[in-house]
Amino acid sequence: MLRLLVVASLVLYGHSTQDFPETNARVVGGTEAQRNSWPSQISLQYRSGSSWAHTCGGTLIRQNWVMTAAHCVDRELTFRVVVGEHNLNQNDGTEQYVGVQKIVVHPYWNTDDVAAGYDIALLRLAQSVTLNSYVQLGVLPRAGTILANNSPCYITGWGLTRTNGQLAQTLQQAYLPTVDYAICSSSSYWGSTVKNSMVCAGGDGVRSGCQGDSGGPLHCLVNGQYAVHGVTSFVSRLGCNVTRKPTVFTRVSAYISWINNVIASN
């Protein structure tokens, strides 16, 4: 049996010698992203007393809609979204803060079984944000698009910089080439834990997602343009950067119809 770690920074898990998925990811082995280089990246924050704390990433897909992971928002908390963010610990002068008016979690999401898939949610914002050089909409792939093995992608986020480490202050990025489904679902990788509605990337034992990266984007270069092909979902509970345990993402192209339907009906 495998054990997974979802990558939202709120949830603390014990460790085991068995390898399960964990849904708390941050960028391990990455570097600080150049300011404004990923303007669709958002910080999802929750109210903690009189302050706010980063818990997950996400992608701005409309001026009043954000895409993130279901496991980031399936708790009774008060959330807000910060766009134009770079340094979580200081005012960059480019941020816009907006409340979350409605949360739409995929109806098939099961909190107790991240490996079943459907780890995706949409957040309707209380008001539209203003687009500028610091805040842009993420490009989504065409429905059904499957990336070839070793496609060039970057994960971005403020997650832990190492297993059991601390959240990054500034937005990080790491190069994570894709691992196709045939390889990622083989017994020496994730086996049957991975479904074809997911994308695997990384697995070199150096670079990965980690706690705090959950819900954030996997940006992949296709035909000269970066598009958001993944929503960060889970890593191995044995550690964020375990060899042959690539970071696993919800495959956005499997949910394009659902995304469009939710936005149109809300």
Swiss-Prot record:
Residue ranges annotated as transmembrane are none
Write the gene name: CELA1
Domain Peptidase S1: from-to ranges = 27-264
What this protein is reported to do is described as:
Serine proteases that hydrolyze many proteins in addition to elastin.
What is its cofactor?
Answer: Ca(2+)
Q: Could you identify this protein by its name?
A: Chymotrypsin-like elastase family member 1
* The keyword Hydrolase is annotated on this UniProt entry: yes
Q: Name the InterPro entries for this protein.
A: Peptidase_S1_Elastase_sf, Peptidase_S1_PA, Peptidase_S1_PA_chymotrypsin, Peptidase_S1A, Trypsin_dom, TRYPSIN_HIS, TRYPSIN_SER
Stated family: Belongs to the peptidase S1 family. Elastase subfamily.
What do the Gene Ontology cellular component annotations say? extracellular space
Listed SMART domains: Tryp_SPc
User: What EC number(s) are associated with this protein in UniProt?
Assistant: 3.4.21.36
